[in-house]
Amino acid sequence: MTFAKRLLAGFAAILMATTAWADDHAAPEALPMALWSTYEIPAGAKPSELEVSLKEYLKGEEKRGFNNCAMYKHEFGSPRAFYTTCTFDDIDHFARIMDGSPSVASPDEVQLFGSHMDHIVLMTKQGMTKMPKYVLYASTAFSPHLNHVEMQAKAEEFYSAYDEGFGECNRYEHAWGPELAFYATCGFESYADFAAGVNKVMKIFEGRLATANLNILNHRDDILVKVMD
């Protein structure tokens, strides 16, 4: 299956999920999409300068029409970077924002960050009720021989352990950008909370997932700390 077909299959699966309700049931509320951006802290730079610049940038993005912008910073994992997120209702909302006004950043502005990445993702499950102090950010890509529906099923099987361990997790999948992957973000307020969550997750990994055929191609876990919400 080509990239384009997988992308269309993902949108189709979400559309079917929202329309396959009987007439006597209310359809579930549509979940937002999100723009995730990563701004690497270059060697020798002052993270505080980049942080101030990005805070002003995000305030401007909310004025442009994005919803609920927030920023987190690297704590454990890679790369050493700031991670920003802004939500929007759907791709048409995104188009109105992008066509309606220019970005706050000036084309002549000095670039304070190193490498940079933008990624549009679809939220598929919302478990967080607030922006937590810390976020466990998990990214998983599955074997390319799977079709998109099979990848979604594997992601559900794998990330269910995160849901059970940490309780408050959001789920996302790729919509547009640099990688075809599935994501979980789980919140916690202290490293004691993190340890408690990990202990629960590891029991699941050592139990029902120990022999599960998950077809994982690559995986990473990062810990991020809140800078702005």
Indicate where each model-derived feature is located.
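Short S/T/G/P-rich N-terminal loop/turn motif that feeds into the first structured element of a domain
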Residues: 22-229
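N-terminal compositionally biased, intrinsically disordered segments and leader/signal-like regions
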Residues: 3, 19-20
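Bacterial N-terminal signal peptides
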Residues: 9-17
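Bacterial N-terminal signal peptides that target proteins for export
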Residues: 1-8
